Curated annotation (Swiss-Prot):
Swiss-Prot/TrEMBL catalytic activity: Hydrolysis of Ala-|-Gly bond in repressor LexA
Gene3D superfamilies per UniProt: Umud Fragment, subunit A, Winged helix-like DNA-binding domain superfamily/Winged helix DNA-binding domain
Residues annotated as site: Cleavage: 93-94
Claim: DNA-binding is one of the keywords in the record: yes
Origin organism lineage: Bacteria, Bacillati, Bacillota, Bacilli, Bacillales
Any one GO MF annotation of this record: serine-type endopeptidase activity
Gene name of the record: lexA
Family annotation (PANTHER family): LEXA REPRESSOR, LEXA REPRESSOR-RELATED
Name the record gives this protein: LexA repressor
InterPro entries assigned: ArsR-like_HTH, LexA, LexA-like, LexA/Signal_pep-like_sf, LexA_DNA-bd_dom, LexA_repressor, Peptidase_S24_LexA, Peptidase_S24_S26A/B/C
SUPFAM superfamilies with a match to the protein in the record: LexA/Signal peptidase (SSF51306), Winged helix' DNA-binding domain (SSF46785)
Role summary: Represses a number of genes involved in the response to DNA damage (SOS response), including recA and lexA. In the presence of single-stranded DNA, RecA interacts with LexA causing an autocatalytic cleavage which disrupts the DNA-binding part of LexA, leading to derepression of the SOS regulon and eventually DNA repair.
EC number, as in UniProt: 3.4.21.88
Length: 207
C-alpha cells in the first residue's frame, strides 16, 4: 500500500471510527473539525489522495458517500494510476477555472481514460440543451482546459454576461454562435466569449 501522510492517516482513522460507531461516514465539515482543518477544499484534497491511493471510494454526487476499501480492493486500485480531477461548482469571471474557491470536490479518474491530458476539470450539466449530443441534465462533463476551439467543438464558454455554458462552438463572420444540441432551442449569438475548455468526455450515474 502507498504510505499515507500523518494527516491522511488521521482522516482515514476518523472516517473508520465514525462508520464503526454511527454506521455512516462523516461529512467534509466534520472531518475538518476532527483533524483541525478549516478549509473544506483542503479536506477534499486529502480525500482525493486517499482515494487515488486506494483507501477509500467516493460518490461525487453525494456528500457523505465515502466507502472504506478492504485491502484486496485497495491493492487492485493501486495497480492503476489515478488522477484527481477537480469538480467545479461555479465559474467566476476573472478567476482561473480551477481556483480553490470554485472547487466542490475531486473525482478519481484512471489516467488511461484521461487520454494523456493533465489539465482537466469536471462540471455538472444543468438543463437539456445538449441532449442530442448525448449530454443529459445531471451529467458531469470532463473538460480539457484550453482557451481556443475549432468550429464544431463542444466547449465550456463564458459569455459576455459572465454565464458559463456548454455548447457547440462556431466562429462566424462577425460573431460567435454557441449552438445547443436541442432542436427546440435557439443558438446563443455573441460578439465574443471566453473559452474555458473543450469537452472530451461525459460521466453519468444511472438510476
Amino acid at each position: 500500500m502507498t504510505k499515507l501522510s500523518k494527516r491522511q492517516q488521521q482522516i482515514l482513522e476518523f472516517i473508520k471510527q465514525e462508520v464503526k460507531t454511527k454506521g455512516y461516514p462523516p461529512s467534509v465539515r466534520e472531518i475538518g473539525e476532527a483533524v483541525g482543518l478549516a478549509s473544506s477544499s483542503t479536506v477534499h484534497g486529502h480525500l482525493a489522495r486517499l482515494e487515488s491511493k486506494g483507501y477509500i471510494r467516493r460518490d461525487p454526487t453525494k456528500p457523505r458517500a465515502i466507502e472504506i476499501l478492504d485491502n484486496d480492493m485497495a491493492k487492485e486500485r493501486e495497480k492503476e494510476e489515478i488522477i484527481s480531477v477537480p469538480i467545479i461548482g461555479k465559474v467566476t469571471a476573472g478567476q482561473p477555472i480551477t481556483a480553490v474557491e470554485n472547487i466542490e470536490g475531486y473525482f478519481p479518474l484512471p489516467k488511461r481514460l484521461a487520454a494523456g491530458e493533465e489539465q482537466l476539470f469536471m462540471l455538472e450539466v444543468m438543463g437539456d440543451s445538449m441532449i442530442e449530443a448525448g449530454i443529459l441534465d445531471g451529467d458531469y462533463v470532463i473538460v480539457r482546459q484550453q482557451s481556443s476551439a475549432n468550429n464544431g467543438d463542444i466547449v465550456v464558454a463564458m459569455t459576455e454576461d459572465n454565464e458559463a455554458t456548454v455548447k457547440r462552438f462556431f466562429k462566424e463572420k462577425d460573431h460567435i454562435r454557441l449552438q445547443p444540441e436541442n432542436a427546440h432551442l435557439e443558438p446563443i449569438i455573441v460578439r465574443d466569449c471566453t473559452i474555458l475548455g473543450k469537452v472530451i468526455g461525459v460521466y453519468r450515474l444511472f438510476d
